[in-house]
Amino acid sequence: MSRRVVVTGLGAMSPNGIGKNNFWTNTCNGVSGIRRISSFDPSSLSCQIAGEIQGFDPSEYYSESDLKKLSRAVPLAIAASKEALHDAAIDLTQFDEDDFESLGVIVGTGGAGSVSYTHLTLPTILLV
């Protein structure tokens, strides 16, 4: 038995655009999100450029205390998922609990979470 999968909404959080419309416009116009790293001082690194997402406020999704425990990827994924649901005109308040089994959001990331891993292992490495 095969079942159809239908993509009805999109969301994007990317170095070259926050939101699917900004992302698509910048992509079509050849706008790159690669810049000199600004989230920390990269002067001691051989590579000082990266694709950082600029202008995103994770406190719109989580409290400051929660943000200290989460990877930056989590609020980005939530924001993209919310945009995809909005783009699909899906109002979650109109769903019964049983309806959620027929709804899915697929999230993809490229290397997100590696900063959190470094944050967790760095103190251990320095103590050795």
Language model features with spans:
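Conserved small/polar residues in nucleotide/adenosyl-binding loops
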Residues: 118-124
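Active-site nucleophile and cofactor-binding loops and adjacent substrate-binding regions
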Residues: 69-74, 98
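ACP-dependent fatty acid/polyketide chain-elongation machinery
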Residues: 1-66
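A short acidic, glycine/proline-enriched capping/turn motif at secondary-structure boundaries
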Residues: 83-84, 105, 110-114
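Stable alpha-helical structural segments in soluble proteins, enriched in small hydrophobic residues
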Residues: 76-88
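Glycine/Thr-rich phosphate-binding loops of Rossmann-like dinucleotide-binding domains
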Residues: 15, 115-116
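Structural signature of cysteine-dependent C-C bond-forming condensing enzymes
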Residues: 2, 88-104, 120
